[in-house]
Amino acid sequence: MFRTHTCGELRISDVNKQVKLSGWVQRSRKMGGMTFVDLRDRYGITQLVFNEEIDAELCERANKLGREFVIQIVGTVNERFSKNSHIPTGDIEIIVSELNILNSAITPPFTIEDNTDGGDDIRMKYRYLDLRRSAVRSNLELRHKMTIEVRSYLDKLGFLEVETPVLIGSTPEGARDFVVPSRMNPGQFYALPQSPQTLKQLLMVSGFDRYFQIAKCFRDEDLRADRQPEFTQIDCEMSFVEQEDVITTFEGMAKHLFKVIRNIELTEPFPRMPWSEAMRLYGSDKPDIRFGMQFVELMDILKGHGFSVFDNATYIGGICAEGAAGYTRKQLDALTEFVKKPQIGAKGMVYARIEADGTVKSSVDKFYTQEVLQQLKEAFGAKPGDLILILSGDDAMKTRKQLCELRLEMGNQLGLRDKNTFACLWVVDFPLFEWSEEEGRLMAMHHPFTSPKPEDIHLLDTNPAAVRANAYDMVINGVEVGGGSIRIHDSQLQNKMFELLGFTPERAQEQFGFLMNAFKFGAPPHGGLAYGLDRWVSLFAGLDSIRDCIAFPKNNSGRDVMLDAPAALDPSQLEELNLIVDIKE
């Protein structure tokens, strides 16, 4: 037996017990004739004591222990003289009588501490060492607890967990697929699933009216803090349901997770916001409603006064930052540079301060009378000490998105985005289609199987851009943590959808014939939702990136620097797969 207890288990009630522990050397220090070693495992840290007066030879061996050596000890639990209130085992120590070195270790490239000295790149390369840190390990423990709770919750509601294939056919809509060549079928390829969408719909046709899966999904797209090329969904589908049924079920799951994971009781129904309102007031389909600063359109007030930037604009909008009138010129210049960054793309920013006497001082005073500036103040309901920030542009949607970035930045600067405050909502009534300039055609905003709202179906023939989707996203703190829709279950309506998306009947049959054929055998009304497990965990853990809650993540270039993947294949493998690599210059 390597251990009788873990390194996080022993307490004052265990004093005088003989125990056996195994783990890694966190640190050691010599003080007079005593050597103290902190022994660590997944469960915690226990202090070991080696005493020269009791066993000089054993103490000498302990002095040679290096960081991260794997050791086993036998000893007696003793009450600590100098207690450590920061760890659960801080009232006790182990007086060691036997030491067995199970494995030596070279010096790690960074300290295995919560506040490590290792940068992101080095920690990614040695991820197996990074996972020894309690800060990282606790994220995976939280992830485990979440999956257990999800399975338990859905099981009690009659959902069946069903695994769907990972090797499937490629589909043209959405993000790029990762493809896998087939050795047995030269020149043909599988795709890794972006989601189990069509497969779970087939399960509904099969009569499995409540399905779920903790599903690994893959998307070959540009990465950012909340995206990885492979990620995990809590994927669900239900038959004989309407939108309200799905929302009720999964709002219930969200409230359950908040209760059991964060001990937060959410009793009120989550608010619902139409997509058009979210874009108008926040410039985002995933608004952070922890704080205000809603957009105010200012065209009627600011246009036509000789300031050409505004006079030529298609949209003028602003936000009011309460109590921020004390911003210095340097801070305001920094905000201007922020919105002018290439990834945001604004051409400039106008500001107006509300002075203590109620007058308004702006950066464009020479174009506007105090009377007009007072109208500006009234439009926001601004008070003395407030700061108004204004952007304009020739594309209303683009300018609102720029203003959204400015709003979020101000929320950060003013401390309004507390990670321990949670604001949940449903965004509903999305457009069914969006126009793609690149493709020159309508694209499905969600996917081709999303049902239009019944009251908008008649618009498919006359004004498809005005059709709203029977779709819904759950947003928490400005992060889309899940989304879904009621699906099309009628073959004729699905064919109409393919037609509007530019599919020929032949191409639709080639890509989705298996689904359309299944519908002919009686498809029930159905709908579903997928939660992003990684995003939920990062939200509950207060992380800035989902990377920190994935055991072995990729970096921002999609590389696994630990495994050095992706990598070139051996020529013999390429030959076996009938592949030739032709890299364009």
Curated annotation (Swiss-Prot):
Keywords: Aminoacyl-tRNA synthetase, ATP-binding, Cytoplasm, Ligase, Nucleotide-binding, Protein biosynthesis
Region (Aspartate), start-end ranges: 197-200
A biological-process GO annotation: aspartyl-tRNA aminoacylation
Locations listed in the record: Cytoplasm
Catalytic activity, as annotated: tRNA(Asp) + L-aspartate + ATP = L-aspartyl-tRNA(Asp) + AMP + diphosphate
GO cellular component terms attached to this protein's record: cytoplasm
Binding positions for L-aspartate per the UniProt entry: 173, 219, 446, 487
Domain of life: Bacteria
EC annotation from Swiss-Prot or TrEMBL: 6.1.1.12
Main location: cytoplasm
GO molecular function, one term: ATP binding
Function: Catalyzes the attachment of L-aspartate to tRNA(Asp) in a two-step reaction: L-aspartate is first activated by ATP to form Asp-AMP and then transferred to the acceptor end of tRNA(Asp).
NCBIfam families, A to Z: aspS_bact (TIGR00459), PRK00476.1 (NF001750)
Quaternary context: Homodimer.
Family, per entry: Belongs to the class-II aminoacyl-tRNA synthetase family. Type 1 subfamily.
Stated name of the protein: Aspartate--tRNA ligase
Organism of this sequence: Bacteroides fragilis (strain ATCC 25285 / DSM 2151 / CCUG 4856 / JCM 11019 / LMG 10263 / NCTC 9343 / Onslow / VPI 2553 / EN-2)
Gene that this polypeptide is encoded by: aspS
